[in-house]
Regions:
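Active-site neighborhoods and metal-handling regions in enzymes and metal-associated proteins
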Residues: 1-408
Length: 408
């Protein structure tokens, strides 16, 4: 089938019907909580509910949903045609010329106040994900409650709780994203040599993986961002890996370097996550000891995930194993994992203080790490989906040491 003849159902993205069902869930939630209108400012939350993906800037965008089922939006003029191309039909809208005013003499949130007035929401119960637009790219603005001169119930959980359990369509997109994250990692691993430049190998593999993705998927692939590539891989090396989020360093790969990698795909706006610990040349006894400990801890994390347990209970299993069986609790720097989907990190978290109940359809990273100061970090991360009885890995790259040795 030629790209020109592809129907929207063939494209790798969430369809209009699912976006409509998401908004209907919000309408019911508003009615149950006796909330008259909800203002959604977070760009990812706007996209989740409307299908409108955009590049967030200093110009506020807000989606407004009302308990009686109306959909409206605050938009800068420069995004109007973009919203019309992607988003649902609106019952009302407020367009402003520019930020901070574009000659209108009015802050954009005053246009939102006018919109809420037309919707009959002023003076009634209004909620929002956050109390006003986030401060990015030089934006300055008042809280929504100050503009409206009334309380606003601000709660990110109103939308983010709905995002925790993924639909079949979301899981399919993330499964495809995992496939391309795995592919990017393979290209990168196969390109690493002693003397390789860390940055050049990382970016070269990402570009080649993206070329492969576009060649295979063609018009089925629908980009959802202005920045970044659909398939990505990177690594850091040596003692820098002892920092869980160490930055890139200039220089070349050397014999004996420990490598901690990261790779992911993005399909339909949904991400994957894959990380591996590798070694350049033959691993010595010290490396093998920590690698085996990390691998065992990750397996405990896999085994801990099943419906009905809490995130804290799963994390407790991992931390208990690292403390009591490995005697390495002092090498832990972070929790075992996190949810994700449209964002690289999403609620909930596999953390001792997150008591969210695990449900089928949730997607997590599982990535307990051990960090040995001035030596190296040891961390695998895999994308998993919760099933009715446990979990299933979506990232399929080998976890075993024999497959993660780079020839010296």
């Amino acid at each position: 089938m030629s790209d020109a003849l592809l129907s929207k159902t063939d494209r790798l993205e969430i369809g209009a019907d699912e976006y409509r069902l998401r908004r209907e869930r919000v309408f019911r939630l508003l009615a149950e909580r006796e909330i008259d209108a909800l203002c959604v400012f977070g760009p990812t939350r706007v996209a989740y509910l409307s299908g409108f993906f955009f590049s967030p800037t200093e110009r506020p965008v807000a989606l407004v949903l009302t308990a009686d089922g109306r959909v409206a939006a605050l938009l800068p003029n420069l995004e109007l045609s973009h919203f019309q191309q992607q988003g649902p039909k609106l019952d009302d809208s407020a367009m402003y010329p520019e930020y901070p005013g574009g000659g209108s003499g009015r802050h954009p949130l005053l246009f939102l106040r006018d919109l809420l007035s037309r919707l009959g929401a002023l003076g009634k119960k209004i909620a929002a994900d956050v109390d006003g637009y986030e401060h990015r790219w030089g934006y300055r603005g008042p809280a929504l409650s100050a503009v409206l001169e009334q309380p606003v119930h601000a709660d990110v959980a109103l939308i983010d709780d709905l995002r925790m359990v993924k639909s079949a369509a979301e899981i399919a997109l993330m499964t495809e994203a995992c496939r391309w994250g795995d592919h990017a990692h393979r290209l990168m691993q196969d390109s690493i040599r002693v003397g390789s430049e860390e940055l050049l190998i990382s970016h070269g593999a990402s570009l080649q993986a993206t070329r492969d993705l576009l060649a295979e998927l063609g018009g089925r692939y629908v980009p959802k961002a202005r920045e970044g590539l659909p398939a990505n891989a990177m690594f850091i090396r040596g003692s820098n890996t002892a920092h869980p989020h160490g930055l890139h360093e200039a220089g070349a790969v050397a014999l004996g370097d420990v490598l901690v990698t990261g790779a992911y795909g993005v399909v339909g706006g949904y991400e994957s996550e894959l990380e591996r610990t590798m070694i350049v040349g033959e691993p010595d006894a010290e490396f093998q000891r920590y690698f085996a400990a990390m691998l065992a801890a990750q397996q405990v994390g896999f085994d801990a995930l099943r419906p009905g347990r809490t995130c804290a209970e799963a994390e407790s299993d991992v931390r208990r194993f690292i403390r009591d069986e490995l005697g390495m609790d002092d090498l832990v720097r972070h929790h075992t994992g996190h949810g994700f989907g449209l964002e690289g990190h999403e609620h909930p978290f596999l953390d001792l203080d997150d008591h969210t109940v695990i449900e089928p359809g949730m997607v997590f990273s599982v990535e307990p790490g051990l960090y040995v100061p001035e030596f190296a970090g040891f961390r695998h991360s895999d994308t998993v989906v919760i099933t009715v009885s446990g979990m299933e890995q979506l990232s399929l790259y080998s976890r075993e040491l024999d497959d993660l040795v780079v020839a010296g």
